[in-house]
Amino acid sequence: MARIEIDKMSKLLQVYFIMGSNNCTRDPLAVLKEALDGGVTIFQFREKGEGSLIGEDRVRFAKELQTLCKEYSVPFIVNDDVELAIELDADGVHVGQDDEGITSVREKMGDKIIGVSAHTIEEARFAIENGADYLGVGPIFPTSTKKDTKAVQGTKGLAYFREQGITVPIVGIGGITIENTAAVIEAGADGVSVISAISLAESAYESTRKLAEEVKRSL
């Protein structure tokens, strides 16, 4: 198996849904199914924070979400936990700057998809040189979902990555809504990653569909 091609990775990032059991006010599986029906292109399992599942419950829940993603042929990515990604034979893993280093992650994951959160050009270049398939850049806007976020980058911060010659696929993250999606794409992102814009929406299906429309219109 060869590593994913840039064009394919870029398309997969269009509507990137991130979710754990504690990001929903109703059945997470129902939310994910609606989102998949609405046009999610890639999914990340992120089970963190207050009230999150641990141990066997966490693994079982991850498998349920993974099974659903497989039905839709949507890649299933695990946040941070490389060992869980290997155990589940996930499609990939996403790591932050405080998680396991990209070099050892690439060694363990083989040719699977690896995404890395980058807040500076130096972090971005290091990640790319050591095997990142895409970058998560942000937070673009203020967000309440993550408590330990870095300083808000704004769309100017995102555009700066492109101005500095970063050509790998980029997904914008942090405070992204249907209303500000166009600005994120126009600044140079290949897609948007969201949690609450889908997980807490009245209709996960409608919200995802509108996000997908905004991305396609702005690319």
Swiss-Prot record:
Pathway: Cofactor biosynthesis; thiamine diphosphate biosynthesis; thiamine phosphate from 4-amino-2-methyl-5-diphosphomethylpyrimidine and 4-methyl-5-(2-phosphoethyl)-thiazole: step 1/1
Entry's Gene Ontology cellular component terms: cytoplasm
EC category name: transferase
Keyword annotations from UniProtKB, A to Z: Magnesium, Metal-binding, Thiamine biosynthesis, Transferase
GO MF annotation, one: thiamine-phosphate diphosphorylase activity
Binding site for 4-amino-2-methyl-5-(diphosphooxymethyl)pyrimidine: 44-48, 79, 117, 146
Binding-site residues for Mg(2+), renumbered to this chain: 80, 99
Cofactor(s) this protein requires: Mg(2+)
EC number: 2.5.1.3
Comment on bound cofactor: Binds 1 Mg(2+) ion per subunit.
The reaction(s) this protein catalyses: 2-[(2R,5Z)-2-carboxy-4-methylthiazol-5(2H)-ylidene]ethyl phosphate + 4-amino-2-methyl-5-(diphosphooxymethyl)pyrimidine + 2 H(+) = thiamine phosphate + CO2 + diphosphate; 2-(2-carboxy-4-methylthiazol-5-yl)ethyl phosphate + 4-amino-2-methyl-5-(diphosphooxymethyl)pyrimidine + 2 H(+) = thiamine phosphate + CO2 + diphosphate; 4-methyl-5-(2-phosphooxyethyl)-thiazole + 4-amino-2-methyl-5-(diphosphooxymethyl)pyrimidine + H(+) = thiamine phosphate + diphosphate
GO biological process entries: thiamine biosynthetic process; thiamine diphosphate biosynthetic process
Functional summary from the UniProt entry: Condenses 4-methyl-5-(beta-hydroxyethyl)thiazole monophosphate (THZ-P) and 2-methyl-4-amino-5-hydroxymethyl pyrimidine pyrophosphate (HMP-PP) to form thiamine monophosphate (TMP).
Name this protein carries in UniProt: Thiamine-phosphate synthase
Source organism of this protein record: Bacillus cereus (strain B4264)
